[in-house]
C-alpha cells in the first residue's frame, strides 16, 4: 500500500507511504552516526491478516487463489521469505544500504 494505490484505502495507504518517507529522512539524519535505516514492504503473505480484512465469508483457499492470480510470481509469500529480507537488511551483508524500501511482493510493484 505504500508503493501503489488501492481504491478505498486512503488512510491505510497514506500511513504506509509516510513510513517510506520517514525511512528516507531518518536514513539521512542517522547516516553520520553509522546507523542504517531501511524499510520492508511485504506483499501478500500467508498469514491470518488477509482473512481478517474480509467481512463477507470467503474460503481461505479462494482468497489465496485470488491473490495468486494478481501476483507476477503466481504465489503468496511464506512469512519466512519476508523474515529473510529483514535479516538481510539488518546484517553486514547490506552494510552499504540505507534509506531504501525493499519490496518483497513477488513483482506486484514492478
What are these regions (language model features)?
Residues 28-32, 95:
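Alpha-helical segment proximal to the catalytic Tyr-Lys
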